[in-house]
């Protein structure tokens, strides 16, 4: 079916993007019945349990080396993206909606490109400038326009949540690629990132506004968060599979199709919960196109 390793990588990245586009829809529905803290922790525990089973089944659990370069790269990927990035992303879903938060979060290659120019001395190009402009336009279209006063200020403040998530997810693929190049164990890499994320959520719960407490969770919320945890865990796994077959610069932007998946399904799955407009779709398209243009830089 696939004629090259890069094609396998592209297919894996597309699968990850599709799964990550479905997850926010499940989570948004779950937030009808529970709060962000409970939803985040349930989802993260499900992801970890799923990956423990997969790591035992594949035997990759035996490859773990706590002193190796791969372990610490996976650890940083989990600490930055899968924990802080995820919490702020879910806060964004709760405050501004699944489609908007997903679009803003997936502007992360924009921040990656800027950091590369500033700190790594990479040369800016026309593709870089065009991609940045498209992404900025997409985020601007999503931002509140006609609202006035305190409501507009509050909406803008809430947009900081997915923007912070975008920053966290922007550096994430770099750590993933370093780790997967050192040890080609995608399941193990995903497991370490997700376990690290869970650990960081407990350690830094207060600063990031996560409430750690026992609470009753309604059955619909538990089911939806469980499904969301499965899509999150498998989506993350497929990004590692993708990076094991090709460069991050090409494959990372491909799994950023998730805003389009979220937008395409939100109209049918979030009816009565979240208003999704053509403006949201246009913004998602601008951001995704911008990400692909950036990849050409």
Regions found by a protein language model. Give the residues of each.
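Membrane-interface interhelical linkers
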Residues: 1-38, 42-74, 86-96, 137, ...
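Hydrophobic/small/kink-forming positions within alpha-helical transmembrane segments
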Residues: 21, 52, 79-83, 109-114, ...
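Membrane-helix interface/capping residues of multi-pass secondary transporters
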Residues: 36-37, 98, 124, 185-186, ...
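Hydrophobic transmembrane alpha-helices of multi-pass small-molecule transport proteins
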Residues: 51, 114-120, 126-146, 277-296
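Alpha-helical transmembrane segments
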Residues: 77-78, 124-136, 185-196
């Amino acid at each position: 079916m696939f004629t090259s390793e890069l094609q396998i990588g592209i297919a894996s990245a597309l699968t990850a993007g599709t799964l990550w586009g479905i997850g926010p829809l499940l989570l948004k529905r779950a937030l009808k019945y529970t709060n962000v803290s409970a939803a985040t922790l349930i989802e993260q525990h499900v992801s970890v349990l799923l990956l423990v089973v997969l790591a035992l089944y594949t035997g990759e659990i035996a490859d773990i080396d706590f002193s190796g370069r791969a372990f610490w790269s996976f650890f940083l990927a989990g600490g930055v993206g899968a924990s802080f990035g995820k919490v702020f992303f879910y806060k964004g879903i709760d405050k501004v909606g699944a489609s908007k938060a997903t679009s803003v979060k997936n502007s992360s290659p924009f921040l990656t490109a800027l950091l590369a120019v500033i700190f790594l001395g990479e040369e800016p190009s026309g593709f870089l400038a065009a991609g940045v402009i498209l992404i900025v336009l997409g985020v601007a279209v999503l931002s509140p326009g006609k609202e006035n006063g305190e409501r507009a200020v509050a909406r803008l403040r809430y947009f900081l949540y997915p923007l912070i998530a975008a920053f966290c997810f922007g550096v994430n693929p770099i750590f993933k690629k370093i780790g997967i190049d050192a040890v080609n164990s995608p399941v193990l890499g995903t497991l370490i990132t997700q376990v690290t994320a869970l650990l960081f959520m407990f350690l830094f719960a207060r600063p990031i506004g996560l409430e750690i407490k026992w609470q009753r969770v309604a059955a619909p919320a538990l089911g939806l968060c469980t499904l969301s945890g499965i899509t999150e865990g498998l989506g993350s796994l497929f990004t590692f599979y993708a990076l094991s077959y090709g460069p991050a610069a090409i494959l990372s932007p491909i799994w950023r199709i998730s805003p389009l998946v979220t937008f395409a399904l939100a109209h049918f799955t979030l009816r009565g919960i979240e208003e999704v407009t053509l403006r949201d779709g246009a913004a998602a398209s601008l951001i995704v196109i911008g990400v692909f243009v950036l990849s050409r830089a």
